[in-house]
Amino acid sequence: LPPPFWAFAWAGGQGLARYVLDHTESVSGKRVVDFASGSGLVAIAAAKAGAATVLAADIDPWTETAVRMNAGLNGVDIGFTHADLIGRAIEADVLLAGDVFYDRAFADLLVPWFINLTDRGVSVLVGDPGRAYLPKQRLEALATYQVTVSRALEDSEVKKTTVWRFL
């Protein structure tokens, strides 16, 4: 089996979760999708911050069990889907995506989708620690955090992580 990279609290997800908890107005009372949810860290933060509904979305077959267990341990209700949402319209007010710009081909799929969602009125928030394929346009920096990370995953113990809003 490949390593469960989705199980780690990546810097982008940690920064995005912190932002949501610090700025509850970004999700409070809103329908939220946590895209590429992994273990559910950002989805849990959204639920704790008062989101009306939270849907965790991840195509990895192992993630659903982790999300459901972590949600239960945190006393929050989170829906889950394995559907590949890329390119599709979503029933949400906010899409959260932590640390998704690590691969060129993936970024090339995400950027037009995120722009399309934004143009349809969805607030797209992304947490990113300076990955190579983060787009350089149509972004507004909302907050920056110094995030402690695992040396098993990163080249340093702390990563500067920015939360961006697609414009």
Task: Please place each PLM-identified region on the residue numbering.
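S-adenosylmethionine-dependent methyltransferases
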Residues: 1-167
